[in-house]
Amino acid sequence: MILEHVLVLSAYLFLIGLYGLITSRNMVRALMCLELILNAVNMNFVTFSDFFDNSELKGDIFCIFVIAIAAAEAAIGLAIVSSIYRNRKSTRINQSTLLNK
């Protein structure tokens, strides 16, 4: 693939995720948008690693590291969301005042 096409696609994914993260009022949707942002960043890591340094796997290894961190973040985030839903019966961000007390 051409470098510019992949970078434009990654920028679109990043901007869609950022827009969703800013405008989202649902915690699960916000987590999904955060994962979309991380996938756009991973796409850039793999693209630049392949384009600039074809023999090294530094970008690919860093991408696997980010995927592992994102999986842990998603698991912890969903556990927190399910706990808040169990206690508050809502997953709306603006209704959750659990951390303010």
Curated annotation (Swiss-Prot):
It is found in: Plastid, Chloroplast thylakoid membrane. Gene3D superfamilies: 1.10.287.3510. The chain crosses the membrane at residues 2-22, 32-52, 61-81. It is a multi-pass membrane protein. Pfam families: Oxidored_q2. GO terms for molecular function: oxidoreductase activity, acting on NAD(P)H, quinone or similar compound as acceptor; quinone binding. Keywords: Chloroplast, Membrane, NAD, NADP, Plastid, Plastoquinone, Quinone, Thylakoid, Translocase, Transmembrane, Transmembrane helix, Transport. Its EC number is 7.1.1.-. The keyword Oxidoreductase does not apply. It comes from the Eukaryota. GO terms for cellular component: chloroplast thylakoid membrane; NADH dehydrogenase complex. Its main location: plastid. One of its GO terms (biological process) is photosynthesis, light reaction. It catalyses: a plastoquinone + NADH + (n+1) H(+)(in) = a plastoquinol + NAD(+) + n H(+)(out); a plastoquinone + NADPH + (n+1) H(+)(in) = a plastoquinol + NADP(+) + n H(+)(out). Belongs to the complex I subunit 4L family. NDH is composed of at least 16 different subunits, 5 of which are encoded in the nucleus. NDH shuttles electrons from NAD(P)H:plastoquinone, via FMN and iron-sulfur (Fe-S) centers, to quinones in the photosynthetic chain and possibly in a chloroplast respiratory chain. The immediate electron acceptor for the enzyme in this species is believed to be plastoquinone. Couples the redox reaction to proton translocation, and thus conserves the redox energy in a proton gradient. PANTHER family: NADH-UBIQUINONE OXIDOREDUCTASE CHAIN 4L, NADH-UBIQUINONE OXIDOREDUCTASE SUBUNIT ND4L. This is NAD(P)H-quinone oxidoreductase subunit 4L, chloroplastic.
